[in-house]
Amino acid sequence: MILPKVRDPRFVTIRRGGTLTDSEHQLLALWAASCAEHVLDLFESAKPSDPRPRHAVEQARAWARGEITMSQSRTAAGHAMGAARDLSGAARHAAYAAGQAAAVAHVAAHEAAQSARRW
């Protein structure tokens, strides 16, 4: 399970009863994309012709800028997760990090959970 049963209100948008503002949500997505980008080369060295994780990072940033919908970012997240499935080790986790970054548009707590797992 990625998310806890009781969600921290700091990672729930105001529209859903939490305290996370839209600007904070966008900032969280940008931070998640930046974190994922730092390790993306670990995936790309294993699968250099697979663009899905890098595309997910780009989509996370595009969502934060208001250029795409949440659904588009979430779709990119799913594709990045798919890229991770047949890998192991650092390459797999780098693809997952990219997917989680794009998933922040859907649920802000995704990146918080992934960051906690990495450290």
Q: What is each residue range found by the language model?
A:
Residues 1-119:
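Structured binding/interaction patches within domain cores
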